[in-house]
Amino acid sequence: ESGWKDDEIKQSKFPVLERADVLGCFDGEDLISQFAVYPLKMNIYDAVYHVGFVTSVCTYPEYTGNGIMKRLMIQGLTQMHKEGKSFALLYPYSIPLYHHLGWEIISNKISFNIKDRQIPTKVSAPGYVRRVAWDNTEFHELHSHFASITHGCLFRNALAWEEYWRWDEDDTNVAVYYNVK
């Protein structure tokens, strides 16, 4: 059996939704569409901007095509603007859909699959590498430094890290290089 059960999704997403600004549309008592935003900071050409990170965008299929999400997005973006957030970001599951809704792509994720035979067996270098948990303090500090010098990089808080790893934690390894001086 694959996929997520309703209770698993609720349990997984609740920590995000309780700390985000959530807009919803109801049909009577039933939530039929939602749009959630939580605050982050982003390095844009060496200046730090407050941004709204959009997540949990959904509408039941039988309600699509009625402009509900468009209205929720406009309301959410208007609120972000009032709060001084200069940009809204999301990771789209469908680039054509969000492009149709007026969103633009600012970056791409690149993944590499490296076979073990492509890695040198022994390389003399000072220091060592250790696998660490995704919530490792040194890893987060390293990422914060990287964000401070890298255009387009988010400064991730605990909530953003939870959201980032939510779907990949089981099959992802994090490693930190420690330089011995």
Where are these regions (language model features)?
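Active-site rim helix/loop that mediates acceptor-substrate recognition in acyltransferases
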Residues: 2-44, 151-174
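Glycine-rich phosphate/pyrophosphate-binding loop shared by adenosine-nucleotide-utilizing enzymes
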Residues: 30-35, 52, 180-181
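A short, polar/charged loop-to-alpha-helix boundary motif
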Residues: 41-48, 114
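A short, internal acetyl-CoA/4′-phosphopantetheine-binding micro-motif in the GNAT/acyltransferase core
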Residues: 54-64
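Hydrophobic pocket-lining residues that define ligand/cofactor binding sites across diverse proteins
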Residues: 63, 80-81
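Conserved acetyl-CoA pyrophosphate-binding loop and the N-cap/start of the following alpha-helix
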Residues: 63-75
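Conserved active-site alpha-helix within GNAT-family acetyltransferase domains
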Residues: 82-86, 92-110
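Amide-forming acyltransferase catalytic core, primarily the GNAT-like/NAT-type
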Residues: 109-181
